[in-house]
């Protein structure tokens, strides 16, 4: 039995590696990490999206490729090897999985095609579910979220943010809501963005609030 990547997956991986080798040198990545290459970072991001990585986990009926997680793994490996400063895991892996598994048909129709067309970017915060902290937590009541979420991935420049609470309930909020405050956290890897999200009476959509929500959050 063969346990390696398929020819298609290797091809996608090679495209990403080649793009980064041609467009993201160590010096350029260093500038981005030091906050000196905003336009450069945008150009790299736009170029990577032209390879279609944002469509991998979007079902075909929502204008995506309908590929599997191994395709995403292949891309993630290539981005890691090239130190690509791309918000891939939040917007284009975890968000599509959460919406596809936990969203209503209306939510799927509204969000998934816009991820595929790069109209929307998502931040995602699952840290409260996988490792809650005493000084943080979110509470949901009357369709509102309040509280503090830590280590939210890819929240910077996102349009929406997906958050999980301690029970594994998953919620979706507009990042531009007046009750949302986003603070960047300092981490070791400056090519990745993690944030603290402060929430005050923020309108929230329920993405998964069922007896099976734990399974969706785990995935």
Show where each model-derived region lies.
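Glycine-rich beta->alpha junctions and the first turn(s) of the following alpha-helix
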Residues: 2-8, 12, 81, 181-219
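A short, Trp-centered hydrophobic/proline-enriched beta-strand micro-motif
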Residues: 117-129, 163
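Amphipathic, small/basic residue-rich leader segments at the start of a protein or domain
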Residues: 1-89, 110, 114
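A short core secondary-structure module
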Residues: 125, 148-181, 185
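Long, well-ordered alpha-helical segments
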Residues: 16-26, 105-107, 142-145, 168-179, ...
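A generic, well-ordered mixed alpha/beta core segment in the N-terminal half of proteins
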Residues: 101-121, 145
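Cytochrome P450 C-terminal beta-domain/meander region
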Residues: 132-146
